[in-house]
Amino acid sequence: MNIILVNTLYYPYKIGGAEVSVQILAESLIEKGHSVTVVSIHEHNERKDTEHNGVKIIYLPYSNIYWGLSLTKRNPLSKILWHLIDLYNFKIAKEFENIIMDVKPDIVHTNNLSGISCAVWQKAKKYKCRVIHTSRDYYLIHPNCKLYKNGSEMSVKSIAVSLWSLSKKILGKNVDVYVGISNYIKDKHIEAGFFKSTEKYTIYNSVKSNVILDLTAANDKRLGFIGRLTYEKGFDQFCKLAQLNKTKKFIAAGEFDKNSASLKQLALDSNVELLGYCPVDDFMQKVDIIVLPIKWQEPFGRVVVEAIFAGKVVLTNRVGGITELSRILPNIYFLEDIQDIDSIPFPVEIDDSEKKIFNVDYVTEQYLKIYKG
C-alpha cells in the first residue's frame, strides 16, 4: 500500500511520545514492504524533502503567524489569532493537496495535527483516500492539546471546548476510522461529540522491549523522572518528594519549558540532579524507580511502559490511560498508596503475553487491518 502519515513533528524533531510512536509505525510499515511518506511541519520557511530509514519525509513550512513550538512568550491576541488560523490552515491544505496529487496515496493516516489543521482530512477525502485518524493528544477537543488548565482538568462540555472544537467535528466527518491510543482518550473524544458515525478502535502504542536490568541494593534506591519538566507532568511533586527523602538520590532527565523558571530553582533547592536531555535507555541504567506524578489526563504514558520493560518500578497517579496500563502491566504503583519509598516491592518479571499488545509487529498489523478495511 501507498501510505501518507501526518504528524506535527517527525524525526529528528521530538517533544513527546507521539513522534516516537509515529516513527516506529512508519519504519515498521516500510519493513513490511509498504511505501510510506510522512508529512510534518518545521520552523523554516521552505519545504524540505528528505528520507530516513526508507521513509520519505516532507517538512512543510509552518504557515502561521509564528512557529507554534517557539519558547518565546506570546500575547493573548497573537495566540488567539494563531489558533483561529489553525482551525483551517489554507496554506497547508493547498500544499497537502499538491502532495496527494503527487504521491497518490491509498491511505492518509493523521496523528497530531496542531499546526497542520484538520483541513488535511477534507483534502484526502476529495481524492478518495481512506482516512484514518489516531488521537495522541486532545488537540481536536481544545487547542491547548492537554485539556488541563490552571491546575485542573477541563470539561469537554464547557463553552470554550464546544466553540473551539465545532469546526473540527464537522471536518471529522471526512474520517473513515478513528483510533485512540487508550480507551480513555477514545472515550473522551466520543464524550466530546467526535466521530459519531465513524468506526472506532483502541490501539496502544508500540514500545520496544528492553533487557531487564539489575537493581542496586534495596537501601540505595535511585529515583528518576524523565520527560518534560513541567507542572502538568508533576515535576514539582517530584521535587517535593526529594525534599522529604533527602537520603535518596533523585535524578531528572528532560527539558524545562518557557514557564518553568521557578521549577528549575525548586529542583536545585531540592538537590535534584538535572541531566538535561538523556536517551531513555541510558537513563534507565541510572535509576531504580521511575516517579511520574502526572497531573493531566495523560492519554497513554509511553515512559511508563518503557520503564516497566526496562525492569523498573513506576510510581505515578491514577490519570488517563495510565490507569489502564496499571491493569495490563505489573510494577505500577500509585503515589497515594505509598507511605514509604523503602516499602516499595522489587519488580516482578513481565510475562510475554503482557508485552504483546505493545509489540511493534502486533501494533503495525492492527493498523494494516484498519487500512485494508
Curated annotation (Swiss-Prot):
Q: What is this protein called?
A: Uncharacterized 42.6 kDa protein in cps region
Q: Name one GO molecular function term.
A: glycosyltransferase activity
Xref: InterPro entries: Glyco_trans_1, Glyco_trans_4-like_N, Glycosyltransferase_grp1
| Top-level taxon in the UniProt lineage | Bacteria
Supply the Pfam families for this chain.
Glyco_transf_4, Glycos_transf_1
**SUPFAM superfamilies from the xrefs?**
UDP-Glycosyltransferase/glycogen phosphorylase
